[in-house]
């Protein structure tokens, strides 16, 4: 191609415009004819060795072509018209009708191709109407930029409306053609996405113009095609080549949007398969979602079950082929399996871009209301006050804590506050109080199912003011209260009776780990912290944890004050206290015992404090959340495990991996893995090796495991000899422990600060164990001082555990009656506060007598014990210093 002289180009265009009407009358396309003539003139000028096309060349070549076009009609055309009379060599002015039609077409293209898609884009970013009703067309800012390219490209092309601008555009004209092709591909993709609702969109226009949202891509697509036709005609006014072929611009843009949609399309197809009974199907679906699935779409489906109404999701997602749609439970399971994080531990999803409103703030309800799981956090429900009071009686080896919580609800509906609380090791809830109309009301204690049924009847159905506390696995309770009124508050208190830990019987030390949240459905503002105030008969040796440390004030008793985080992400503070060596024996009397009965408490020392199991099975969770604790865990297992111990390790991946000996130093953690199959295999090996203990190191297990029936069978035939020592890294629920709570199989290690050696010490049987027995008559020693009544409550908790042992065929009813008498929350009992006496009577419950509930004020027996035990404690402290 050679360049054109400006005069030659002007001459060619003038002749072409003068003969356009004649060509149209012959049924030919003038633009195609002019393109062919122009190419012919260029080729002949190049063959003659000319550097550019001159006006003379145009006259020489064009006149014969014009004559031949008039003499040779097009095929199937009417007879040739006589030659037109000579015309004025100046360009023909368009008629009034042509001007009106051209301007009207341009105006419609500006409206439908520029202003409408731009307005719909801004409206959807601000309001999110399509995302709420059909599907989210703008899931990311990248999608917003691609959509904005459509009106921008159309506007640039329409701006090239005059010949002068086309000539001035130069190489820019080529880029305008490419952008137009991309706009065609983008508009075609979204027009196809809305194709299922397009027939109804026309009718929806009358409803506040909402139908323009699904119609906008189709109208923009038609406008872009019309603009491309104008660009092809305009190229005759410049030397720029024609616009690039559609498959070079439109097709790549279409495929790019489709690839961006793939992570969203695989979710509805594979999320239901993550819960499939077939392990192979589960593993394949989990692998696909981890590689291709969208975390954001999964998180949204954890809250919403509405199926997106776009073409590709319905067709490729499986809905048109009879596939089962993903339920909320499927999405929650898939989200954990893919990310390794429970959906409730992640902030609720937000509509992207400028829209700002929370999806959870739409018309959703609380699906876990009245259930036995904490579930997701609810916006507007906050912990407004938190205080922890306590009394430590180191002489009796006990402590009593009262945790007072107040919740505030700023959401537009009544809400239920739920929290999973980790108790101090061996602790038991012995008091529950709820403030009703400003007055504290004590709880009634009864059977587990009895109290839950009363709570659901009064709270969920009658929407009154109860609170329920039940166990949720070993050393954990579930607290739930409903309804927290709109713009109102609800206040409750939980009393906990705790035995002091003796981690190492060779040391004159006891430990107390404070309770903490491990999961909650409410938020705690940064300024809200738990105010801790403890009184102790002895000054603590060490206090760890808290936000700014703890302050110890001398006095009688000693005061320990500080602040602790009120969120489940924080670890629990703990105290080390002096313990007399040897610890004195203690008697405890209570009105609920017989007239001549008492509880004797002693501390049993281990026979072989340095002993270690001959064989040990280790199960390591392969979930992603374990990666942060890998260094600590491997140091514990590699540096401190005795070499003579037989060890076999299971890495709990989706399919468990077995390793003879210690675990590999490098472990690949991914997603959220079901630890049930690995525990079953470890239990089978342990049963073959003399019921060797199992050490289970894991992160949160928020989902039920379908593989535990085999583990139950092994535990039943072990007759209580099989033990799983567990340690959880980080907060979160442990549904596996809750599923197996009735077997007393899983025993959490009383770890204080996650030191590597601490786990080994606990496995070496170094700790002392409190022993409590009921004596009567002459069997009661007369030289043993009387201590706290909490010793008797802890004896009752142990007796309830013995009576409800799964190896016993009878005793459960006796255990429930004992829990009701001693007012304890155990695996067979719960505590519930109702609003009226009629509600208690209707459910066969009786609220606790306030005179029998424990309190912070020291008991008379404790004061007497202080006088006797103080010299022993003082002597122990002096020996420690020396």
Over which residues does each language-model region extend?
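Internal/C-terminal transmembrane anchor helices
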Residues: 241-269
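Asparagine-centered strand-capping/turn motif at beta-strand->loop junctions
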Residues: 392, 406-413, 421-423
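An acidic, Ser/Thr-enriched
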Residues: 431-473, 480-485, 491, 495-616, ...
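VWA/integrin I-like adhesion module and closely mimicked acidic/polar interface patches used
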Residues: 632, 666-673, 677, 700-765, ...
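A cross-kingdom C-terminal cell-surface attachment/processing module
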Residues: 862-879
């Amino acid at each position: 191609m050679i360049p054109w002289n400006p005069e030659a180009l002007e001459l060619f265009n003038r002749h072409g415009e003068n003969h356009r009407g004649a060509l149209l009358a012959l049924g030919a396309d003038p633009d195609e004819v002019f393109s062919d003539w122009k190419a012919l003139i260029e080729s002949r000028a190049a063959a003659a060795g000319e550097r550019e096309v001159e006006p003379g060349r145009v006259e020489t070549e064009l006149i014969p072509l014009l004559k031949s076009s008039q003499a040779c009609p097009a095929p199937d055309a009417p007879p040739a018209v006589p030659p037109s009379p000579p015309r004025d060599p100046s360009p023909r002015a368009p008629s009034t009708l042509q001007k009106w039609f051209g301007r009207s077409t341009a105006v419609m293209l500006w409206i439908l191709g520029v202003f409408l898609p731009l307005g719909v884009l801004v409206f959807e970013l601000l309001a999110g109407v399509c995302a709420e009703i059909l599907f989210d067309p703008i899931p990311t800012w990248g999608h917003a930029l691609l959509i904005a390219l459509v009106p921008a490209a159309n506007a640039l092309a329409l701006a090239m409306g005059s010949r002068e601008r086309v000539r001035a555009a130069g190489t820019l004209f080529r880029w305008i053609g490419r952008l137009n092709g991309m706009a065609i591909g983008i508009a075609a993709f979204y027009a196809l996405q809305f194709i299922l609702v397009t027939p109804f969109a026309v009718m929806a226009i009358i409803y506040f113009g909402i139908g323009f949202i699904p119609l906008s891509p189709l109208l923009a697509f038609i406008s872009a095609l019309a603009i491309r036709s104008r660009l092809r005609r305009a190229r005759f006014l410049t030397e720029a080549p024609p616009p690039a072929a559609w498959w070079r611009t439109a097709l790549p843009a279409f495929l790019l949007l489709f690839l961006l949609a793939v992570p969203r399309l695989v979710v509805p197809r594979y999320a239901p398969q993550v819960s499939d009974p077939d392990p192979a199907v589960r593993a394949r679906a989990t692998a696909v979602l981890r590689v291709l699935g969208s975390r954001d779409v999964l998180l949204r489906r954890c809250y919403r079950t509405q199926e997106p109404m776009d073409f590709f999701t319905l067709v490729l997602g499986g809905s048109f082929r009879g596939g089962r749609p993903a339920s909320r439970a499927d999405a929650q399971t898939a989200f954990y399996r893919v990310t390794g994080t429970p959906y409730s531990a992640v902030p609720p999803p937000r509509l992207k871009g400028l829209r700002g409103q929370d999806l959870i703030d739409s018309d959703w309800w609380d699906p876990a209301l009245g259930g036995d799981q904490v579930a997701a956090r609810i916006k507007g429900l906050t912990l407004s006050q938190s205080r922890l009071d306590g009394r430590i009686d180191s002489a009796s080896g006990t402590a009593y804590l009262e945790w007072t919580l107040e919740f505030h609800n700023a959401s537009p509906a009544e809400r239920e506050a739920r929290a999973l609380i980790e108790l101090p090791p061996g602790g038991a809830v012995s008091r529950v109080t709820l403030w009703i109309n400003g007055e504290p009301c004590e709880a009634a204690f009864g059977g587990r199912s009895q109290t839950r049924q009363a709570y659901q009847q009064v709270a969920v159905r009658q929407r009154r003011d109860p609170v329920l506390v039940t166990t949720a696995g070993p050393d954990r309770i579930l607290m739930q209260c409903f309804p927290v009124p709109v713009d109102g508050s609800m206040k409750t208190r939980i009393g906990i009776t705790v035995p002091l830990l003796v981690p190492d019987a060779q040391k004159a030390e006891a430990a107390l780990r404070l309770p903490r949240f491990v999961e909650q459905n409410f938020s705690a503002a940064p300024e809200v912290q738990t105010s801790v105030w403890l009184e102790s008969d002895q000054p603590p040796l060490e206090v760890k944890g808290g936000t700014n440390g703890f302050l110890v004030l001398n006095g009688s008793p000693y005061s320990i004050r500080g602040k602790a985080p009120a969120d489940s992400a924080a670890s629990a503070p703990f105290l080390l206290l002096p313990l007399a060596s040897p610890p004195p024996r203690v008697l405890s009397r209570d009105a609920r015992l017989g007239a001549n009965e008492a509880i004797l408490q002693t501390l049993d020392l281990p026979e072989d404090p340095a002993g270690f199991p001959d064989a040990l099975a280790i199960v390591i969770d392969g979930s992603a959340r374990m990666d942060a604790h890998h260094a600590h865990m491997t140091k514990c297992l590699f540096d401190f495990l005795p070499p003579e111990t037989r060890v076999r390790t299971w890495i709990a991946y989706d399919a468990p991996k077995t390793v003879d000996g210690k675990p590999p130093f490098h472990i690949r953690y991914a997603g959220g893995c079901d630890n049930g199959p690995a525990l079953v295999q470890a239990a089978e090996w342990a049963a073959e090796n003399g019921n060797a203990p199992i050490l289970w190191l894991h992160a949160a297990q928020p989902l039920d495991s379908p593989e535990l029936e085999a583990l139950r069978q092994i535990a039943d035939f072990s007759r209580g000899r099989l033990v799983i020592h567990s340690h959880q890294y980080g907060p979160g629920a442990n549904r596996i422990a809750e599923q197996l709570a009735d077997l007393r199989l899983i025993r959490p290690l009383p770890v204080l600060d996650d030191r590597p050696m601490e786990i080994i010490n606990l496995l070496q049987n170094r700790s002392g164990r409190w022993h409590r027995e009921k004596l009567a008559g002459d069997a009661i020693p007369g030289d043993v001082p009387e201590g706290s009544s909490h010793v008797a409550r802890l004896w009752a908790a142990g007796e309830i555990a013995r009576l409800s042992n799964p190896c016993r065929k009878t005793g459960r009813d006796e255990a429930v009656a004992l829990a009701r008498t001693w007012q304890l929350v155990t695996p067979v009992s719960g505590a519930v506060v109702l609003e009226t006496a009629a509600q208690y009577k209707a459910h066969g419950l009786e609220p606790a007598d306030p005179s029998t509930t424990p309190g912070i004020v020291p008991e008379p027996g404790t004061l007497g014990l202080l006088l006797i035990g103080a010299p022993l404690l003082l002597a122990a402290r002096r020996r420690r210093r020396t």
